[in-house]
Amino acid sequence: MLEEQYLNLERYVLENGHLKGDRTQTGTLSTFGYQMRFDLSEGFPLLTTKRVPFGLIKSELLWFLKGDTNIRYLLQHNNHIWDEWAFKKWVESDEYQGPDMTDFGHRSLTDPEFNELYKIEKQRFTEQILEDDTFSAKYGDLGNVYGSQWRAWKTSTGETIDQISNVIDMIKNNPNSRRMIVSAWNPEDVPTSALPPCHSLFQFYVADGKLSCQLYQRSGDIFLGIPFNIASYALLTELIAKATGLEVGEFIHTIGDAHIYSNHLDQVKEQLERTPRPAPKLKFKQVHDSIFDYEPGDIVVEGYDPHPTIKAPVAV
């Protein structure tokens, strides 16, 4: 069963993980170098042992594929995954005249009074991003995040490389190539990035008329992050298979530092007590010639009947 791949990762780290400190000072149980394999012909690997919001996954992936780096598109689709990174740029700017938002990520979790103030300020910010083109251009853009690296990698000569278009062309015209790789990891950007790319590099492989994808993820939050990553790259594989006239093969997920945060241990144990349900099916309401023309409404999952959401704090 598809989901057992993920549940076995949780079990393995609970039983064998190393206690480690981390950037967020939360503490983790961690292992290094873990691989999962998902046969996409068996269904779509959206977890059923807890609800995973597919709407957020597809709008974020399509945002990446459009080469967009401004959160306005996400906000238009009620997706707030990247809000904090843009909000941080705003509250640290000279133009911001509101209440002190220093260390808002930590304070919003530990100070209920501050959290209410933070929510008001962030809502004002996102509304202004949606309504004000000039403000959005200045404070909604996140710079060299995934969309930029995938679609407009900056070279030393000042040109850009569209890695997604290049890899689709290679799959169509040279499917035996071992160079069908997209990288988001740019050593030059790492020191200045708010969060260097976690899903760093992925590679495609064609055999027997099927397209497979392997992701190398340098760092993976097992409870909150990895379920998103699995579904996102499975969807990417499906989209590129459609664009190249291939069936889907496997999604192979290789993780460097795979970790469970210490404040997620109870949630992981609760999830492991649940019985997986049948995997949903991915359906396309409309198929486009170009992978870059899809909108969230074109893609749905059918037969998704998950167990309820399990809430957990985000490590900041």
UniProtKB/Swiss-Prot annotation:
The reaction(s) this protein catalyses: dUMP + (6R)-5,10-methylene-5,6,7,8-tetrahydrofolate = 7,8-dihydrofolate + dTMP
Amino-acid biosynthesis among keywords: no
Catalytic residues identified in the record: C198
EC class of the enzyme, as a word: transferase
InterPro entries: Thymidate_synth/dCMP_Mease (IPR045097), Thymidate_synth/dCMP_Mease_dom (IPR023451), Thymidate_synth/dCMP_Mease_sf (IPR036926), Thymidylate_synthase (IPR000398), Thymidylate_synthase_AS (IPR020940)
Location, primary (coarse class): cytoplasm
Pathway: Pyrimidine metabolism; dTTP biosynthesis
Enzyme Commission number(s) of this protein: 2.1.1.45
GO-annotated molecular function: thymidylate synthase activity
GO CC entries: cytosol
Highest taxon, organism lineage: Bacteria
Subcellular location: Cytoplasm
Biological processes per GO annotation: dTMP biosynthetic process; dTTP biosynthetic process; methylation
Entry keywords, A to Z: Cytoplasm, Methyltransferase, Nucleotide biosynthesis, Transferase
Protein residues bound to dUMP: R23, R178, R179, R218, S219, G220, D221, N229, H259, I260, Y261
Keyword Methyltransferase belongs to the record: yes
Role: Catalyzes the reductive methylation of 2'-deoxyuridine-5'-monophosphate (dUMP) to 2'-deoxythymidine-5'-monophosphate (dTMP) while utilizing 5,10-methylenetetrahydrofolate (mTHF) as the methyl donor and reductant in the reaction, yielding dihydrofolate (DHF) as a by-product. This enzymatic reaction provides an intracellular de novo source of dTMP, an essential precursor for DNA biosynthesis.
Quaternary structure (record): Homodimer.
Protein name: Thymidylate synthase
Organism of provenance: Pediococcus pentosaceus (strain ATCC 25745 / CCUG 21536 / LMG 10740 / 183-1w)
Higher taxonomy: Bacteria, Bacillati, Bacillota, Bacilli, Lactobacillales
